[in-house]
Amino acid sequence: MEHLLSIFVKSVFIENMALSFFLGMCTFLAVSKKVSTAFGLGIAVIVVLGIAVPVNQLVYTHILKDGVLVDGVDLSFLNFITFIGVIAALVQILEMILDKFFPALYSALGIFLPLITVNCAIFGGVSFMVQREYDLVESVVYGIGAGTGWMLAIVALAGLTEKMKYSDVPAGLRGLGITFITVGLMALGFMSFSGIQL
């Protein structure tokens, strides 16, 4: 149990997808204007990572890994295309669910919901799972933790962006300029967690 808690805390704070690895920056910067929209996208990322990482772990372990299906046959060269296919299918299912049950959130996310399919934070989570050789339970914990860390970062950035609307930001820094500075300062803050040994 302590090992699983360690994986979760590391994936949320120490190895944050957005602020340590800078993965998923396209949607991270574009959807961080309002806290409500950022929160909705964060939940979507948690759901996709929480399902995609363990499903891809099963696919990798039982189909693609060297010698699993047939001795001497290594299908790991199909990792990328298989992982992307599984992620795309999960995002399509999530998109249909949001359209049916949460139409306001679906329209607020707009084009960025299908972009989760090619979001490098999602693919990075799956790739890190393979690289670190997590089992199924560890994959579930890691997927949910990585999604939670990404959501924490985007909601914090959205909150800061909403506060900056009322600030006197110099004309040359308005928009993406001040956002990049803010993300850099947030990343520096999250670097303080890197000294924690779990």
Curated annotation (Swiss-Prot):
The chain crosses the membrane at residues 11-31, 35-55, 77-97, 110-130, 140-160, 176-196. One of its GO terms (biological process) is sodium ion transport. Pfam families: Rnf-Nqr (PF02508). HAMAP family: NqrE. It is found in: Cell inner membrane. One of its GO terms (molecular function) is oxidoreductase activity, acting on NAD(P)H, quinone or similar compound as acceptor. The lineage of its organism: Bacteria, Pseudomonadati, Pseudomonadota, Gammaproteobacteria, Pasteurellales. Its main location: membrane. Its EC number is 7.2.1.1. NCBIfam families: nqrE (TIGR01940). Keywords: Cell inner membrane, Cell membrane, Ion transport, Membrane, NAD, Sodium, Sodium transport, Translocase, Transmembrane, Transmembrane helix, Transport, Ubiquinone. PANTHER family: INTEGRAL MEMBRANE PROTEIN OF SOXR-REDUCING COMPLEX, NA(+)-TRANSLOCATING NADH-QUINONE REDUCTASE SUBUNIT E. It is an enzyme of class 7 (translocase). It is a multi-pass membrane protein. GO terms for cellular component: Gram-negative-bacterium-type cell wall; plasma membrane. Composed of six subunits; NqrA, NqrB, NqrC, NqrD, NqrE and NqrF. NQR complex catalyzes the reduction of ubiquinone-1 to ubiquinol by two successive reactions, coupled with the transport of Na(+) ions from the cytoplasm to the periplasm. NqrA to NqrE are probably involved in the second step, the conversion of ubisemiquinone to ubiquinol. It comes from Haemophilus ducreyi (strain 35000HP / ATCC 700724). Belongs to the NqrDE/RnfAE family. This is Na(+)-translocating NADH-quinone reductase subunit E. It catalyses: a ubiquinone + n Na(+)(in) + NADH + H(+) = a ubiquinol + n Na(+)(out) + NAD(+). The keyword Ion transport applies.
